[in-house]
Amino acid sequence: MKWKYTDYRPEGFECWSAKWKEDYELTVYQIGENRYSIGWYHKGCRVIKDYIDANSWDEAKTLAIARVKNYFHQMATYWDNMELGFIKWTREE
């Protein structure tokens, strides 16, 4: 099974990913009806793995960003001036 990028963004897909400054990536996976797993990676190594409850993908992405900001207070000023463009990943069998 492979993952591929698409920029089509309907609700209910399994993984969204956003890159920041080439070395960082934030992922949001839906693992249940209102349950999401988030990962924060630096150069491909996971720094944070956490779980959040949200009612929609938009809320999950907002909460994921807030969670990362909470872990890295020193990065908050960078995050406030950054736009994350989330990209949906879909599975290919």
Model-predicted segments: where are they?
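Negatively charged, low-complexity tracts enriched in Asp/Glu with abundant Ser/Thr
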Residues: M1-K21, T77, N81-T90
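Short aromatic-glycine-(Arg/Gly/Cys) micro-motifs in beta-strand/loop hairpins
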Residues: L26-I48
